[in-house]
Amino acid sequence: MSNYYDVVDIAPGIKRINSSENAACDLIIGTKKAALIDTGLGLGDLPALVKSITSLPLIIFNTHCHCDHIGGNGQFTQSIYMGKEDIPTCSYSNSVYFRKSMMEHRDLPENFDEEEYLGRGFGHLIPTNEGDTFDLGGLTLMVYDAPGHSSGSRAYFIPERKIIYVGDSVLRTVLVFGYGAASRKTYIHTMDKLLKLPFDKILASHSYNPLQREDMERCKRVAELADYETGEPFENPIRDGETARIC
């Protein structure tokens, strides 16, 4: 199982957990507690990996409700913090349909139990809101509402390391607004707010390496230039029953 994950040191106490799932998780290790941000698809034994790195009490956070970020929630016994607006949609985004689709074309680990995986829940969720602060001992995790990619997306800022975790709010490829997303105007407001924070690095879930402030500025510009509201609709090639638009 150790070969399934690739753990990268980003900064003192900050570790990025990559895998073939292409949905990174992040471990923040203070002197008193550790925090895990997102649990990926949950195809590997993430709890065992975390325990091999730290024995500190663990707090778990989700950036948003999509199954490639909460797929491993059910592997943990701890309660998990998530934006309150996203909690009602977890049953949909964590459905067997989406889990099966996420398994396709993946390098599954040895001894992978498909039946257990498809029947796994998404854990006991606790709503978190902007202004919530968690003292890990020498490192502080600050919560910011970040609606856009989903209505309940959250960003997590570590001021001592000038690092911000954004989930899927910032991507290097294209902005995707699917089921449960907030409006384009709301997303632009989120970017404006987060850009005021004094961060140097952005840890985005689908980027192997840290992103820079310019990447967030670029995403904001794309959202400003897009014309989704009057764009030409077409059938979503990824999710049945949804309509996408050419902007």
Predicted features and spans:
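Short glycine/proline-enriched coil/turn segments at helix->beta-strand junctions
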Residues: T31, T54-P57, N73-S79, P159-R161, ...
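Active-site HxH/HxHxD metal-binding segment of metal-dependent hydrolases
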Residues: L43-T133, R221-E235
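Conserved beta-strand hairpin/beta-sheet module of binuclear metal-dependent hydrolase folds
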Residues: N3-S52, A155-L171
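Short coil/loop residues immediately preceding or within conserved phosphate-binding loops
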Residues: A23, G123-L125, G131, G138-L141
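Metallo-beta-lactamase
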Residues: A34-L36, L41-G42, T133, T140-F234
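Short, hydrophobic/aromatic-rich segments at coil-to-beta transitions
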Residues: I10-R16, G131, T140-M142
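Short Gly/Pro-enriched turn/cap motifs at secondary-structure boundaries
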Residues: I17-N18, G123-L125, D145-P147
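C-terminal regulatory/interaction regions
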Residues: E232-C247
